[in-house]
Amino acid sequence: NILSLYTSHDTAATFIDKNNKVKVLEYERFVKQRYAAFTQTMSYREGLGTTDEQRESFLQYIKDNVKGEIKIIIISDPDVNDYDIIKSYFPEAEFHIIGHHDAHASSGYYTSNLKEASILSFDGGGYDATDGECYTRTYVGKGDNITIVKSYNYSLGIPYGHLASCIKEIKPGPDCDKHSLVYSGKIMGLCGYGNIRPEWIAAMTYYYTTMQQVSIPLNQLGESIGLNLDFNSIEGQDAYDLAATSQYVFEQRAFAILNEMLAQGTSKDIILVGGCALNVLFNQKLSQRLKDIGGTLTVPPYPNDCGLALGQFLSYTQKKTKVSAYAGFDILDRDKFDDYKEKYKATKCSISNLVDHIKDGKIIGILQGESEIGPRALGNRSIICDPSIKDMKDILNSKVKFREW
């Protein structure tokens, strides 16, 4: 049997379980720590590292649920410092390495119904066995094979997310104020309040071409457009317009990459993977453009790093594989259900009762079956409420989701 482990932030494991199901287990759900990393090389980013006790519990859970004996373990980083602890649970296993973007591409293509596709993998970067650090790459999938088309030495994810560090209204996550993993989603949400500033586009485009890991290009951008872009330095309409202009440039650069690939006669059926594939504003525009030329857009439910363990697994097996969007953990404390019923004086609730509660402004949590994989709630671990009720968005964000907007 094969075990695939992605051990950086958004750690996950993929294997075949005793019921012959493909499992994709997200570590953050197991340790109750958002973006949790199995590897302790991430401990320098506050809130991401985990303890040996947590790591051992996760490996034991895998060992208890995997089918047969693990002979192959797939990882993405040859510098991973976790060989010893992994090897102690699976002493007979050989280690194999699959590159970051190869895994992303595989997670999208091998789980799709497409016999041929053009693939764009783009994010904040990751290790590749041949190119070292790699940020953006295009591929062609055909039959059971995936072939690299072109690698790009710039990231769209890093400049997009890093821009949020200067906006006061965006609360950074706990991991690191300058490289917070929450930034990209929040600045995308802020775009709706802003307008594209045509006079900023040239400077923003230059920022995108130079920004990788350092803050100097952000300071240069601020000088070019007349804003102080230090940490938590701007707010209001300038901040909103900065977000909207950044979104515009992000989209133009992503379209340019795809147009370059399509100009070579590759398939008009596009698969997007990598963290940038969570940018639904871009995805909507791309979907319409592809529809106009007879193409389609596919984005798997797990395009970000939580899907890398699955991608590594599929890159190794190179087989089209049906993977349920509900391939995650079963309810981890199912055995305590009777205790909870007694403790909270639970009563059975019919569908009509639930509807009445929702109409009365209650917020309902849904917990059933095995969890979704990926960052989008799809009904098994979900929150539902009535959005037509005045201030419901603000109530939900303040009491449950703790979001700014």
What are these regions (language model features)?
Residues 22-45, 225-245:
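Gly-rich Lys/Arg/Thr-decorated short loops/hinges at beta-loop-alpha junctions or inter-strand turns
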Residues 49-56, 96-100, 244-252, 348:
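Conserved phosphate-coordination/catalytic loops
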Residues 55-59, 102, 160-163, 250-258:
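Short, hydrophobic/amphipathic alpha-helical packing segments
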Residues 68-78, 267-275, 365:
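Short glycine-rich phosphate-binding loop at a beta-alpha junction
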Residues 2-35, 68, 80-93, 97-206, ...:
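Flexible beta->alpha loop and helix N-cap segments adjacent to enzyme active/binding sites
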Residues 30-66:
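N-terminal phosphate-binding loop and adjacent alpha-helix
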Residues 56-71, 258-266:
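Phosphate/pyrophosphate-binding loops at sites that engage ATP/ADP/AMP, CoA/4′-phosphopantetheine
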Residues 174-268, 280-292, 321:
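A contiguous, well-structured pocket-lining segment that forms one wall/lid of small-molecule binding clefts
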